[in-house]
Every structure is written in C-alpha cells, then in structure tokens.
C-alpha cells in the first residue's frame, strides 16, 4: 500500500464505497445473466435534484484540507479511490501538472520516491463517474481500449476517459457544438490519445475516415433519437462483440411519462438494433431522471457443447 500523503484544500469528496461500488447510491438492473437481479429501481421523480451540468456538487471535488489521503485501486481498471476524511473517485493524470476543468489534483509519493498525480472525478459533472458510483458492474473502458465518445461537450469526462485508456488507448471525441468544441480541441492538444471531431453524431459517414474500429462506444447526446444515433455509429465503428455505454435522460425523450417507462422503451429500441443490454443503473442522486445502460453489440451466440 502506498504511504499516506497530505491532500490539498478543496471541496468535499464523494463517497466511493469501500469496494468502489458506491453502495449508498442505488444499484442497477440486470438484463439476464448479470451479476444481480433487480438491485434497485431508478429513483422516483420527486427526489433531490442532481446539480445542473457544469455546476453544483462540491465546487472543486477535492479532499478536505490537511487530511491524510491514501489512493487505492478501484475494481474498474484505471479508476482509483482516494481515501481521506472524505472519499473521492480519481484517475491517474495522463498529463501531470495540468488540470482540465479546475478539478482538484492529488500527488502521491511512491516508496521509490517517484510521484504520481491523480485528478478528482466529479460525479456531478460526469455521467460516467455517476454510473461508477451507482455501482455499474462493468464500464468496459480500460487501459489500452479504443473508445468512441458521442456528445463530448467541452471534454470534462473525455479527459478522464483519456486517463483511463492511457497512452496505449485512444478516444475519438465527437461534439457538434463549435463553442464546446473549442474547449475540446484545446484539451486534446495536451492529450495525445484524444482525437477531437467537431461533427454531428447523426452523420457518422462524415467522420468515417477519421475513426477506426473501436472496443466501446460511450454516448451522452441527450436527443430523442439517441438510440438510433448510437446504432448508426455502431454500424460504422463498433467491433462485433464490442460494448456500449449510454446515458439516457428521460425528459429529453418523453417528459409526459414516468422516467422508468422511458428507460424500458429505450432498452427495447436498443435490443432491436443488435445491442444486448446487460445492466442499468440510476444516476441519482447526481442527475435527476437519468439512467446508464451498458451492454454488448452483435454478441456471438454461445456454442452448445456436445454431450460427451
């Protein structure tokens, strides 16, 4: 175990749970063959609201000033838990010394004297971090992975995915807004494993020459036709047997029915497009009426073993 180090000042941390599961934030729903059954429904519509994107939550997501901090590996490869007076989700900074969105950084000294810098991952500003703290079984984004990220915005979560996949991996980050795209491009100048693409994710043919086959697609486009957008991109870029992670915002699809009904409808749409959803977790309390669905794509049928 690494020796304790002193964390700097900042906002409060986020409870990560001892096993990195974030037990206090609701479980997920398994779609058959998963690790669990129905571990927890998406929260009711009246619950405490997660802070709007880009604001709220602990402002810098750091550790309490003056506390001793120990960094331990999370069960998801490339993710870590910083434990002090408050626990926080962190990733190993691919570009030490550089912050992306004014996030708190923690420096840990190894026994051999070398230092490793980690960046606090704020779940109020990242759907993927919220899903991890919600107890998602597998995000499929790991060191060396090639990821297509749809709806990259200014690159907050993309930067942490960049940390996760490391120098051997690659993140193709697609964003339609030119304003957000400027921030994304600036971030990518220092992160050589991020390839920013300022295009509409509805038209993957426009960037087919820029993107290779990928292991995982992460989608956070918040559009009524987001299942179709994911399917279009998967048909171009997602390898057979690859995986997807999609953030679903119920109000963007149908604000007239319960969030749970919207999630069920979207899962059915995904199943019709050769996706095999494996689990669903709520993003409460970080985001209201959001769910994250994870699964496989064009999964090979299991071979029946002949009787001996």
Curated annotation (Swiss-Prot):
InterPro entries per UniProt: Fibrillarin, SAM-dependent_MTases_sf
Region: Disordered, residue numbers: 1-68
Positions that bind S-adenosyl-L-methionine: 156-157, 175-176, 200-201, 220-223
Signal peptide segment: none
Description of what induces expression: Repressed by abscisic acid (ABA).
UniProt-listed Enzyme Commission number(s): 2.1.1.-
Biased composition (Basic residues): 42-52
Gly residues bias: start-end ranges: 22-35, 53-65
Disulfide bond positions: none
Catalytic reaction list: a ribonucleotide in rRNA + S-adenosyl-L-methionine = a 2'-O-methylribonucleotide in rRNA + S-adenosyl-L-homocysteine + H(+); L-glutaminyl-[histone H2A] + S-adenosyl-L-methionine = N(5)-methyl-L-glutaminyl-[histone H2A] + S-adenosyl-L-homocysteine + H(+)
Any one GO molecular-function label of the UniProt entry: snoRNA binding
Tissues/organs with expression: Expressed in roots, leaves and flowers. Expressed in stems.
Keywords: Methyltransferase, Nucleus, Ribonucleoprotein, RNA-binding, rRNA processing, S-adenosyl-L-methionine, Transferase
Cellular compartments annotated: Nucleus, Nucleolus
Primary localisation category: nucleus
Family designation: Belongs to the methyltransferase superfamily. Fibrillarin family.
Subunit text: Component of box C/D small nucleolar ribonucleoprotein (snoRNP) particles. Interacts with SKP1A.
Domain commentary: The N-terminal DMA/Gly-rich region (also called GAR domain) is rich in Gly and Arg and functions in nucleolar targeting.
Function field: S-adenosyl-L-methionine-dependent methyltransferase that has the ability to methylate both RNAs and proteins. Involved in pre-rRNA processing. Utilizes the methyl donor S-adenosyl-L-methionine to catalyze the site-specific 2'-hydroxyl methylation of ribose moieties in pre-ribosomal RNA. Site specificity is provided by a guide RNA that base pairs with the substrate. Methylation occurs at a characteristic distance from the sequence involved in base pairing with the guide RNA.
Protein name: rRNA 2'-O-methyltransferase fibrillarin 1
Organism of derivation: Arabidopsis thaliana
Source lineage: Eukaryota, Viridiplantae, Streptophyta, Embryophyta, Tracheophyta
Gene designation per UniProt: FIB1
